[in-house]
């Protein structure tokens, strides 16, 4: 069966690295679950986003996956230590991208390919908002309003 391409993505297939279905704790890990949690919390307090924390833990500490060691996902670990993100990181990055495209379109209103790109990004935003409202990560009354969220562009 041939891989089905995702809607509004340039990548056509499913090639790429695949994480193991049942990750086990690698033998070379010398950190306890408590130490991994403390490292993650320290990085979050220094201003790192969850994806950046994962990259730092992987590249500098040799920790491939927080969940395999602690038994909890990284965001759950941070929430337990009082660090909560009001907007999930993937949604926040899409909103920032949409705001950058809007700023570009103010200067270049006839750039139709950017206008189409904005439509694609905003449709992803709306789909994610619907999902996060359904699972309870966003409040039910959350509304995507580019003018109100313009402070997130930085």
Swiss-Prot record:
Q: What's the short name of a Pfam family annotated to this entry?
A: Ribosomal_S13_N
Q: Which GO terms describe its molecular function?
A: small ribosomal subunit rRNA binding; structural constituent of ribosome
What SUPFAM superfamilies does its record include?
S15/NS1 RNA-binding domain
UniProt cross-references to InterPro entries, sorted A to Z: Ribosomal_uS15 (IPR000589), Ribosomal_uS15_arc_euk (IPR023029), Ribosomal_uS15_N (IPR012606), uS15_NS1_RNA-bd_sf (IPR009068)
UniProt entry keywords in alphabetical sequence: Ribonucleoprotein, Ribosomal protein
SMART domains linked: Ribosomal_S13_N, Ribosomal_S15
- Basic residues compositional bias: what residue ranges? 1-14
Give positions of region: Disordered: 1-24
Cellular component, GO annotation:
cytosolic small ribosomal subunit
State the PROSITE patterns in the record: RIBOSOMAL_S15
Q: From its record, what is one biological process in GO terms?
A: translation
Which HAMAP family does the protein's record reference?
Answer: Ribosomal_uS15_A
Q: Which family does it belong to?
A: Belongs to the universal ribosomal protein uS15 family.
Q: How does it assemble?
A: Part of the 30S ribosomal subunit.
List the NCBIfam families: PRK08561.1
| Protein's name in the database | Small ribosomal subunit protein uS15
The uppermost taxa in this organism's lineage are:
Archaea, Thermoproteota, Thermoprotei, Thermoproteales, Thermoproteaceae
């Amino acid at each position: 069966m041939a891989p089905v391409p995702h809607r509004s993505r340039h990548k056509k297939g499913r090639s790429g690295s695949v994480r193991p279905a049942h990750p086990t704790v690698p033998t070379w890990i010398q950190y306890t679950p408590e130490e991994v949690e403390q490292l993650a919390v320290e990085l979050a307090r220094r201003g790192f986003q969850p994806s950046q924390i994962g990259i730092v833990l992987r590249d500098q500490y040799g920790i491939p996956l927080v969940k395999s060691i602690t038994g909890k996902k990284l965001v759950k670990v941070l929430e337990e230590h009082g660090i909560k993100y009001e907007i999930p990181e993937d949604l926040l990055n899409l909103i920032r991208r949409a705001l950058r495209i809007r700023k570009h379109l103010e200067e270049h209103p006839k750039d139709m390919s950017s206008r189409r790109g904005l439509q694609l990004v905003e449709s992803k935003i709306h789909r994610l908002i619907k999902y996060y409202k359904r699972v309870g990560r966003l409040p039910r009354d959350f509304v995507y309003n580019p003018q109100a969220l313009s402070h997130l562009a930085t």
